């Protein structure tokens, strides 16, 4: 089994990538830019996949993070793509991802204080 530390690093990297992809965009620009939307959606899927790979025990130990909602969002994106509401994706990227990144970073440092790089 892949170490949970690596999934946390994946989530942080994907969150950072979301911020990079939306930099310089406002809501209307994002909604009109299919390339940026696809990139952000991919990173949100990576975040959800990483969250789904964490053990239940790990997720229970960190209840402040809405793990189930993150995984459910990933599942919706993957299985119900044509029902996506792009303004919700924008709000997720701009409002929720930065908070999640801070939460996951704090968990990483608390759980694995000597190891914050993938190697």
Residue locations for each model-derived region?
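Solvent-exposed interaction patches of small proteins and small membrane subunits
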Residues: 1-119
């Amino acid at each position: 089994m892949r170490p949970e530390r690596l999934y946390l690093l994946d989530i942080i990297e994907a969150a950072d990538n979301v911020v990079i992809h939306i930099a310089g965009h406002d809501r209307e620009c994002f909604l009109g830019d299919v390339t940026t939307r696809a990139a952000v959606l991919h990173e949100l899927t990576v975040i959800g996949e990483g969250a789904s790979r964490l053990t239940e025990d790990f997720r229970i130990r960190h209840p402040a993070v809405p793990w189930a909602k993150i995984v459910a969002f990933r599942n919706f994106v993957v299985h119900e793509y044509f029902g996506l509401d792009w303004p919700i994706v924008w709000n997720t990227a701009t409002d929720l991802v930065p908070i999640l990144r801070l939460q996951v970073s704090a968990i990483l440092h608390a759980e694995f204080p000597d190891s914050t790089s993938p190697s």
